[in-house]
């Protein structure tokens, strides 16, 4: 019974990765849209996009870490 609860909890915690994937998609969609509107700002927009990517991916990695902690503890 405890093993089943660990697997269910780990799966539910891993659902946070869905949000990270959506966030990364939104960040790079905004980058493509911004560069298509104003190509001269490509360098500055790319810097902001990488920062947004890192922040949204960090939340996904935290969710993955919690999932692994629930699974292997």
Swiss-Prot record:
Family membership: Belongs to the ATPase C chain family.
Keywords in alphabetical order: CF(0), Hydrogen ion transport, Ion transport, Lipid-binding, Membrane, Mitochondrion, Mitochondrion inner membrane, Transmembrane, Transmembrane helix, Transport
Gene: ATP9
Single GO cellular component term: mitochondrial inner membrane
Role this protein plays: Mitochondrial membrane ATP synthase (F(1)F(0) ATP synthase or Complex V) produces ATP from ADP in the presence of a proton gradient across the membrane which is generated by electron transport complexes of the respiratory chain. F-type ATPases consist of two structural domains, F(1) - containing the extramembraneous catalytic core and F(0) - containing the membrane proton channel, linked together by a central stalk and a peripheral stalk. During catalysis, ATP synthesis in the catalytic domain of F(1) is coupled via a rotary mechanism of the central stalk subunits to proton translocation.
Gene Ontology molecular-function annotations: lipid binding; proton transmembrane transporter activity
Pfam families in UniProt: ATP-synt_C (PF00137)
Broad class of the protein's primary localization: mitochondrion
Record-level GO BP terms: proton motive force-driven ATP synthesis
Membrane topology term: Multi-pass membrane protein
Domain of life, source organism: Eukaryota
Protein known as: ATP synthase subunit 9, mitochondrial
Location within or outside the cell: Mitochondrion inner membrane
TM ranges: 12-32, 50-70
């Amino acid at each position: 019974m405890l093993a089943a609860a660990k697997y269910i909890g780990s799966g539910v915690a891993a659902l946070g990765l869905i949000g990270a994937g959506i966030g990364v998609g939104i960040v790079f969609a905004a980058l493509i849209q911004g560069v298509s509107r104003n190509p001269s700002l490509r360098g500055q927009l790319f810097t902001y996009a990488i920062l947004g990517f890192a922040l949204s991916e960090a939340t996904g990695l935290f969710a993955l870490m919690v999932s692994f902690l629930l699974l292997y503890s």
